[in-house]
Amino acid sequence: MDSPCQPQALNQALPQLPGSVSESLESSRARMGVESYLPCPLLPAYHRPGASGEASAGNGTPRTTATATTTTASPLREGFGGQDGGELWPLQSEGAAALVTKECQRLAAQGARPEAPKRKWAKDGGDAPSPSKRPWARQENQEAKGESGMGCDSGASNSSSSSSNTTSSSGEASARLREEVQPSAPERLALDYIVPCMRYYGICVKDNFLGAVLGGRVLAEVEALKWGGRLRDGQLVSQRAIPPRSIRGDQIAWVEGHEPGCRSIGALMAHVDAVIRHCAGRLGNYVINGRTKAMVACYPGNGLGYVRHVDNPHGDGRCITCIYYLNQNWDVKVHGGLLQIFPEGRPVVANIEPLFDRLLIFWSDRRNPHEVKPAYATRYAITVWYFDAKERAAARDKYQLASGQKGVQVPVSQPTTPT
């Protein structure tokens, strides 16, 4: 019998949603993210501090290379922080519940896929209403029945033009209703996949985020920044005796997306903004009203990485970290550069390969200490942090924030709190 303290595999715990944010997702595909893999009773129990419930993935092989291992992390260094707010600080031991249960293992061994939960949103978690249950479906059926009955009872007295007008009118009404109710692709991605993943795991991996064409343009702009000498060594807030390059080995540039030669980076940020905007109001008590500039980072491939750290251990306002990777044909066994996340209170390590067109999202606070393993090839990433309004306002009153943390206002339409 396995020990409950034994590290568990996370390779099935981060299921992937097919398709990219730039393409329209069918309802059946949009639903394939988290729900198809999670046991029904477990999803709402996530993210209650000190909760004893556990969670895992059921049957199915997710389309991701994010895995978990028992790899021992490099020791956490105390008292250092990056200019981007990456702080190295002792971690709290308390956290959310463990990730895997024996019941889930039993289901997986039997090849059983749990039935998708059908719940409304809940304050302590929950899931989105199934997009396949369209609010307009009943009206369409009623309209179809009405049209059919009209054709049977009217006889010769009803003209074909009247029937045609009625059908046309009802069709236009249905089309308008679809347009009003049907969520956009970023909205479906946010509600059906990112929000449940963040509530349940605190980590979300989305492949094929932009698509090969736009992703390739972003990569070209980042490479131009590097070869144009625009990148500078990443800095540390705390200046100690230890050389900064022994803590972090990346070169960075802060980009708004409006600069010449950075339009595609701006388009990337617009896509990420759109997804996060639809998450607003559904991720705990956070009120997301802005973000940092985009931090373009390059590890030059000389064996440097970034030691284990927490992005926001002291409440500087950042609540969500989004990282977009740009590394084509990347092989971590050859090139290194693996990102490892150590979810607080869970006996797992999430290994995230920095693959091209992959978007990684995770909580910025002490729940997700992480590190970048030494990279032996040029490794590119773009990172942005989203602010919680209340914490950010408090941080402004307390601290003089580093220049790289000056926020960019992002218009966020706060959705109505789901019921």
Swiss-Prot record:
Binds 1 Fe(2+) ion per subunit. 2-oxoglutarate binds at residue 379. Keywords: Dioxygenase, Iron, Metal-binding, Nucleus, Oxidoreductase, Phosphoprotein, Ubl conjugation, Vitamin C. A motif (Bipartite nuclear localization signal) lies at residues 89-134. It holds the Pfam family 2OG-FeII_Oxy_3. The modification Phosphoserine is found at residue 130. Highly expressed in testis, expression was also detected in the heart brain, liver kidney and lung. Expression was lowest in spleen and skeletal muscle. Constitutively expressed during differentiation of C2C12 skeletal myocytes. Residues 237-247 are annotated as: Beta(2)beta(3) 'finger-like' loop. Disruption phenotype: Null mice exhibit a lowering of oxygen consumption in skeletal muscle. Glucose oxidation is reduced to around 35%. Hypoxia tolerance is induced in myofibers. Residues 115-126 have a biased composition (Basic and acidic residues). Residues 1-89, 108-181 are annotated as: Disordered. Ubiquitinated by SIAH1 and/or SIAH2 in response to the unfolded protein response (UPR), leading to its degradation. SMART domains: P4Hc. It catalyses: L-prolyl-[protein] + 2-oxoglutarate + O2 = trans-4-hydroxy-L-prolyl-[protein] + succinate + CO2; L-prolyl-[hypoxia-inducible factor alpha subunit] + 2-oxoglutarate + O2 = trans-4-hydroxy-L-prolyl-[hypoxia-inducible factor alpha subunit] + succinate + CO2. Fe cation binds at residues 309, 311, 370. The Beta(2)beta(3) 'finger-like' loop domain is important for substrate (HIFs' CODD/NODD) selectivity. Interacts with E3 ligase SIAH2. Interacts with LIMD1, WTIP and AJUBA. This is Prolyl hydroxylase EGLN2. The gene is Egln2.
